[in-house]
Amino acid sequence: MNVWELRSGWVDSFAPLIVADFDNARASLLISDGLPKEWQKPPSVEFLVEKRSKKQLPRADVPALVPGALALSAKAKDALGAFLSSFGQILELDCRDEPAYYFNVTNIVDCLDREASTKRPDGSIIKEAFLADRVPSEPSVFKDPAKARSRIYVNRAGKDAIERIVAEAGLTGLEVGDPGTA
C-alpha cells in the first residue's frame, strides 16, 4: 500500500471537541473541502463533557472534531505545524478550554482509482484504491477531490515523517491507518 488515511483516533478513549453555541453558519466553517479558509471570527469549540459521568475522558493532542480535518492542541501544533503547514492552513479555533487549532488540508491530489475502489450501491466510495503513478513520492499530506470532505491522506514518506514527529513529541490521538477502516 502507498496511501494511508490521517485521522483523529481513539474516539472512545479521548474527549472530542464539539462546536460550542451551535449555529449552522458558524459550524459550516469547519467543513473541510480542500479549499482555503478565511475566518472573520474563528468557530467556537469546546471539549465534550459527559454530564452523567464522574470520570471524564482525557484530552488528546489531536482530538476528534469533524471528518476530513484535524484539530490540534498547542503541543501538536508546535510539533507538527512546520510539516503540516506545507500542505494546508493551520487556523486558530476559539476554544473555551485551551488553545486549539484547525488543520485545513488544501493540497489536492487527484489519485483515487474510482474503478478499482469498493463502492456502495449508490456509487459512493467506501474503500479507496489509488493510482500509484499519481501519488506523490516526496512526503505529502493531501486530499483527493472525490473524498475531500471526509478524508485526509498521507503517502509513505509523509506517514514516516508524521510517525517520527508523533513519537518524538509524545503526541496522543493521531492515527495513520488504512483508508475506509475507521
Locations of the language-model features?
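A glycine-rich, hydrophobic loop/mini-helix early in the fold
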Residues: 37-65, 69
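Short low-complexity stretches enriched in small and charged residues
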Residues: 21-23, 55-63, 106-109, 128-130
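Short catalytic helix/loop segments, enriched in acidic residues and glycine
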Residues: 25-36
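Short, well-structured hydrophobic secondary-structure segments
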Residues: 56-102
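A structural signal for short, well-ordered beta-strand segments and their strand-loop junctions
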Residues: 5, 89-93, 173-177
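Short, extreme N-terminal leader segments that mark the start of a protein/domain
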Residues: 1-26
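Acidic, proline/glycine-rich low-complexity IDRs
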Residues: 31, 51, 96-182
